[in-house]
Amino acid sequence: HMRSVEMFDQNFGKIIHMLKETGHYDDTLIMFTTDHGVPYPFAKCTLFDSGIHVALIMRDPKPIVKGVHIKGLVSQIDVAPTICDLLGIEKDDGYQGKSFAKVFSNLHEEMDEAVFAEINFHTSYEPARCVRTKDYKLICYYGDYEKINRSNIDNSPTKQYYMEHGMLDKEKCMLALYDLANDPLEQHNVIQEKEYQEVYQMMKQKLETWRKETGDMALPLTEDKWEKAWQVNQPACIDPKSKREEDFIQ
């Protein structure tokens, strides 16, 4: 991980140097982000923060606010409308995201009250959705495979270690509520605890409303509906790069 950070720093530095050398540094909007968390178990291709919390670094050439770390909630669907506002471009009516361009001039500008994320499949079918607020997260799985979906985890020594220490038998929480203020690592599912039932209902309503507003639906589960071009593993497949015919939905 630290080597990846070092490589990013070195190569991003080359881009900054080139912009300065060509005289475009002070008229260029600069942004760096990533698509998901690290490719380890319980990170990439999960809805834990370790999977959906990604880097986002932006520089507006003429900001009032600069060089600060902002802790508000932002979704990547907010990036396109933000770029439009910063560059003075008319936004498309179909954008679902909310521009956070005003943050560059006002640190106290309101950010997203909640953000949403989803999984359908990486190499195998695993429909899941989540809603995250500042203090809570609700994760819902909509499939019927209750074990950890190993084929959606990239192969690595870390994955091998987890498989040798019980991950093959471990079941995931199909419905989970996390108190992020007190449990930032999402280790304790409080969905059954009495004092969290009001929070659960609130988060459930937010997620259901979002799904209705966006026309969200899980991908078809029946095997005859898969596109022929898709490579779709069986849920119990361990290796995402398996070449065994029985590991695939034909």
Regions found by a protein language model. Name each.
Residues 18, 22, 85-86, 103, ...:
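Structured segments of extracytoplasmic/periplasmic soluble domains
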Residues 18-75, 96, 235-243:
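Histidine-centered active-site microenvironments of extracellular/periplasmic hydrolases
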Residues 32-40, 44-46, 96, 119, ...:
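Short, solvent-exposed turn/loop segments enriched in Gly/Ser/Thr/Pro and often Arg
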Residues 38-40, 80, 87-176, 214, ...:
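C-terminal cap/loop subdomain of S1 sulfatases and analogous C-terminal strand-loop tails that border
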